[in-house]
Amino acid sequence: MHWSHSFYERQDALTGCYHAPIHPFHTSLAARVTAHRGQPGPLLELGAGGGQFTIAAALAGHRVTALEWMAGAGEHTRLLAAQHGTTVQALTGDFYTADPGGPFDAVCYWDGFGIGEDDEQRHLLSRVAGWLAPGGTAYVDVYTPWYWAHHAGFTRQTERYTQTYGFDAEGCRMLDTYAPREAEAFTQSLRCYSPADLCLLLPGTGLTLAEVWPGGAYDPKAGVYHPEVPLGESMMYVAVLERA
């Protein structure tokens, strides 16, 4: 079984990350997308998790469709929507086969790109291009190889689990392993791309790289997350993609 078929459910069971409230980060991110687009509009979020960004975007005026393959995640999205007095369309399905409708002015995929191999990434990006309306924009979090190579071996202890960062140098993949106190460890493995590498992936997908927004970085020694750092220090960046 592919690691992604169980990782996110086990991560949520261990940390509750998909059942959390909306964080100011989600509100800020929704505001940034709205400002970049110039106005709210139809928006698709892939890998919506518990719907925190989905609801933040809806509160910013977007008409949001949330697509998440993990069963049950849509329930929390709908719960958040009710709590905040808004409505969204929450769908459960595979990104590679589901039909979320559209077209969309914006497609967002946060913290999950790189699950498969290059051909699978190309296939997904081709689908994203097909979902975009003319003049639409895709916003995709992409993990950087340099951060994960530099911080491989970092370990964080909590009462319930140990978390360890790793890096597969041959496959250029970040590794994020959770080891519960009394259960088998499980690992997330995502393909990392520099902006130059991403540009090599895009031909034939119908998308082109328009901008790069450097992301943040977690400082393991200080135990502090810095939300904005230079690209050469960031854990990930947002690839702003437009139809070619």
Predicted segments, located by residue:
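Class I SAM-dependent methyltransferase SAM/SAH-binding core
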Residues: Q52, A56-T97
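SAM-dependent methyltransferase
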Residues: Y139-L201
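Class I SAM-dependent methyltransferase "Motif I" SAM/SAH-binding loop
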Residues: G47-G51
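Short catalytic micro-motifs in class I SAM-dependent methyltransferases
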Residues: D111-G112
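A short glycine-rich, Lys/Arg-flanked "PGG" loop and its adjoining helix->strand segment in the class I
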Residues: R122-P134
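C-terminal lobe and adjacent flexible extensions of AdoMet/dcAdoMet transferase-like proteins
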Residues: D197, L201-A244
